[in-house]
């Protein structure tokens, strides 16, 4: 059987440059109409028991070259169990080594979350008691912008994920959060649904997800730089969601992401927005502190530098939503690399840990739910 490489499937991304026996030289393809690239996902067939060397030759030109040192690629032979494999970054090239036990092996930047799995998730959750579904609009490629709703309370809670499609851990987080929220035997879920109304977007960027992009939608727009002035022509995904937020109000919002370079889980807030409300900021810090005490997978030491007062970029979701609605707003970041605080030499940061973090984040939200504002009022 001849060794072949293919990425012509949902979320796939790779270009074969040259093959020299079991050493294959590859390039990651740029996002459409963009210079961003780092996400890869492809399959190798016909290489059973062969020691593969897969060399990504353009790694140094990727969006975040600091993401490659100490990184290990993910591999699976059944597309269910994803493990890390020997990977090194040297002279601007990323080399992945693996010996398949069967004739099919899949390699990815992180465990993929396919659009088929997304549709399965939406259908499974929409069929549960008390869960509603709304299509808030369509993407540039015509895909539905899927929103799940639940809860009877007055506080408006928004959870959004995967503005950057290559950050697949964000939708794994969503799967864990949704499974907990819809568990009728879970007291945390019951409390939250009693006290709040949830609006949940598991995938903000379906086009980029399907196309195998790292950070952009179909036309090359970075959705997390579109929240100040979204347009139907460039970023309908953001425009439709923000328009709906204008109708529902936003009291608490978490925007879920992955970070290429920082091997930790952390939160970023909105301290640089104009006219920062100290009580609003205090609630964010309280949430962050409680989460750090609750799970060893979260920490407060590593993360992004704070914006100077009044200097926040209001094109980012967290800043815009905190400013626009006086919401307790935050960005959650998870690593592509292994997790330095609690390393796992076999899987690294994984879908399973992402899902568990989704459950844990809800536990802290339940602790604080009575302290949150209602429609931007009553900050305490």
Swiss-Prot record:
Disulfide bonds: none annotated. Zn(2+) binds at residues 164, 167, 257. Its cofactor is Zn(2+). PANTHER family: CYTOSOLIC CARBOXYPEPTIDASE, CYTOSOLIC CARBOXYPEPTIDASE 1. Residues 111-369 form the Peptidase M14 domain. The active site is at residue 333. GO terms for molecular function: metallocarboxypeptidase activity; zinc ion binding. One of its GO terms (biological process) is proteolysis. Pfam families: Pepdidase_M14_N, Peptidase_M14. This is Uncharacterized protein ZMO1242. Transmembrane segments: none annotated.
């Amino acid at each position: 059987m001849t060794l072949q490489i293919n990425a012509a499937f949902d979320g796939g991304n790779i270009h074969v440059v040259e093959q020299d026996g079991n050493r294959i030289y590859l390039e990651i393809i740029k996002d459409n109409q963009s210079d961003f690239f780092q996400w890869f996902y492809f399959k190798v067939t016909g290489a059973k028991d062969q020691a593969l060397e897969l060399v990504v030759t353009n790694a140094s030109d990727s969006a975040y070259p600091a993401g490659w040192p100490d990184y290990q690629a993910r591999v699976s032979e059944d597309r269910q169990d994803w493990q890390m494999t020997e990977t090194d970054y040297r002279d601007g090239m990323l080399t992945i080594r693996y010996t398949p036990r069967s004739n099919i092996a899949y390699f990815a930047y992180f465990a993929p979350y396919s659009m088929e799995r997304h549709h399965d998730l939406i259908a499974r959750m929409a069929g549960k008691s008390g869960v509603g579904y709304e299509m808030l609009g369509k993407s540039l490629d015509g895909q539905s912008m899927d929103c799940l709703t639940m809860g009877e309370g007055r506080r408006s809670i928004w959870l959004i994920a995967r503005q950057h499609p290559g950050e697949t851990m964000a939708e794994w987080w969503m799967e864990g959060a949704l499974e907990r929220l819809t568990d009728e035997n879970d007291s945390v879920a019951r409390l939250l649904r009693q006290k709040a109304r949830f609006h949940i977007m598991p995938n903000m960027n379906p086009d980029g997800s399907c196309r195998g992009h790292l950070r952009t939608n179909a036309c090359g727009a970075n959705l997390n730089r579109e929240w100040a002035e979204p347009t139907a022509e460039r970023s309908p995904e953001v425009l439709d969601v923000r328009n709906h937020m204008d109708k529902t109000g936003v009291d608490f919002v978490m925007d879920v992401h992955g970070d290429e370079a920082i091997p930790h889980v952390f939160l970023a807030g909105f301290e640089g927005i104009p006219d920062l409300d100290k009580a609003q900021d205090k609630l964010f810090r309280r949430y962050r502190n409680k989460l750090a005490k609750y799970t060893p997978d979260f920490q407060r030491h590593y993360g992004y530098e704070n914006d100077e007062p009044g200097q926040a970029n209001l094109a980012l979701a967290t800043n815009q939503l905190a400013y626009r609605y006086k919401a307790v707003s935050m960005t959650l970041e998870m690593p592509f690399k292994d997790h330095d605080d609690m390393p796992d030499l076999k899987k690294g940061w994984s879908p399973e840990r992402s899902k568990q973090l989704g459950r844990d984040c809800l536990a802290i939200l339940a602790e604080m739910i009575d302290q949150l504002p209602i429609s931007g009022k009553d900050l305490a």
